[in-house]
Amino acid sequence: MTTMLTTPLSGWSQLSLSYLTLTVGALALVVVLYISIDRFPAPRWLSKKYQLIGQKDPASTTSLECPYSYIRQIYGHHHWAPFVHKLSPTLQHDDPAKYKMVLEIMDAIHLCLMLVDDISDGSDFRKGRPAAHRIYGPSETANRAYFRVTQILNQTTTGFPHLAPWLMQDLENILEGQDLSLVWRRDGLKNFPTAPSERAAAYQRMASLKTGSLFRLLGHLVLEDRSMDDTMTLVAWYSQLQNDCKNVYSTEYAKMKGAIAEDLCNGELSYPIVLAMNAPDGHWVELALQSPSPRNVRNALRAIRSDNVHQMCMAELAESSSSIQDWLALWGRKEKLDLKST
C-alpha cells in the first residue's frame, strides 16, 4: 500500500485561491443580479415615480392655489376657443353668456380628466412640467378635479338647463370609455379579443367613448344637435391615435413626459401596442403588458417600432387626417414621430 503525501499550500497560494474564489463568486452574483433586474419589474418603491416627492409647500413651485388652476395655466384658459369659433363663428357675439359657459365646461371636463388620468398613470410630467399630483398630492388633485366637475354640472343645470342633458350623457360616455381602458389594464388580456380585426375594433370603440365623446360634447354644446358628430369623432380618433403614437415613437414627447413608452410600462393598451401584439415577436408585447421588466419592454418596443407596425400606424394617421386638415390646424400638435426599431 502506497501512502499519498500532500503538501500544504503556502500562505501565498492560499491567499491567491481565496481571492480567486471571491472573484468568481462576485462575478456570479453580478450575473444573477443582472438577469434578475433585466427580467423582473422593479419594485414599485424603487421606481423614480415613488422616489419623486412633491414640494411640501406648493407655493415654492407655483403661486397657484389648486391643481386645477395649475393645469389650466399649462394649457391656457379656454383652449377650445378656436374650435368653438369654427363651429359657430358668431356665437361669441350672439350669445356671450353661452359662449363663455361652453368654454368653461370644456376646460373643466378636459383638464379634470387629465388630472385624474395622470394620477392613474403615475405620470411625473405634463407637457414638460411636473404633473399636478406631484406638487399637490394625489388626494387633493383628485378631489379638486371632482369638485370642479361638480361645480360645472351644477352651473350648467341651473344656468343653462338645455345644455345639461348633452353634458351628462357625454360625460357618462367619457367615463365609460376610461373605465373600459382601466379594466383592460387591471385584468390584462384575458378579456380582450384575440382576433386582430376584433382587437382593433375593440380599441377604437373604447377610444370613441373616451376621447370621441369629449370632442362630440363640444359640438353638442355649441350647436345643440348631432350634425357634427361624424367630423368630431374623426378629429378625436386622430387625436387619440397621434397621442398613442407619440408615446412610443417620439423622442420629444418622451422628454416632456419624462418616460419612454409610458403606456406599455403601465400595462395600458394603445393603437401601436394592439397592432404589435399580432406582429412577429408580438408575444413580447403581451409579456411586457403582464410583466414590464426591462427585458420584456425592450423586446416589446422592438416589435412596436418595427417597420410593419410603424407603417400601419402612419397609414392610419394619414387616412384619418385626410378630410379634416382644417380642424387639425386648430389642434396644432406636431411632435416628430422619429423613433423606430434599431
Curated annotation (Swiss-Prot):
**Its membrane topology:** Single-pass membrane protein
* Pathway named in the protein's UniProt entry: Secondary metabolite biosynthesis
Q: Binding of Mg(2+) 2: at which residues? A: 117, 121
Q: Where in the cell is it found?
A: Membrane
Q: Where does Mg(2+) 1 bind?
A: 117, 121
Source organism superkingdom? Eukaryota
Where is the chain membrane-spanning?
Answer: 17-37
GO molecular function terms listed in the Swiss-Prot or TrEMBL record: metal ion binding; prenyltransferase activity
Q: What is its EC number?
A: 2.5.1.-
Residue positions annotated to bind dimethylallyl diphosphate are: 126, 210
Which N-terminal stretch is annotated as signal sequence?
none
**Swiss-Prot/TrEMBL keywords:** Glycoprotein, Magnesium, Membrane, Metal-binding, Transferase, Transmembrane, Transmembrane helix
Q: Name one GO cellular component term.
A: membrane
So which residues have sugars stuck on them? 154
> At which positions is isopentenyl diphosphate bound?
110
User: Tell me, what is an example of a GO biological process annotation in this record?
Assistant: alcohol biosynthetic process
- Which Pfam family is one of those matched by this entry? polyprenyl_synt
What does the similarity note say? Belongs to the FPP/GGPP synthase family.
**What is this protein for, i.e. what is its function?**
Prenyl transferase; part of the gene cluster that mediates the biosynthesis of the indole diterpenes penitrems. The geranylgeranyl diphosphate (GGPP) synthase penG catalyzes the first step in penitrem biosynthesis via conversion of farnesyl pyrophosphate and isopentyl pyrophosphate into geranylgeranyl pyrophosphate (GGPP). Condensation of indole-3-glycerol phosphate with GGPP by the prenyl transferase penC then forms 3-geranylgeranylindole (3-GGI).
User: Under which name does UniProt file this protein?
Assistant: Prenyl transferase penC
Q: Which organism is it from?
A: Penicillium crustosum (Blue mold fungus)
Upper classification of the source organism reads: Eukaryota, Fungi, Dikarya, Ascomycota, Pezizomycotina
This protein's encoding gene: penC
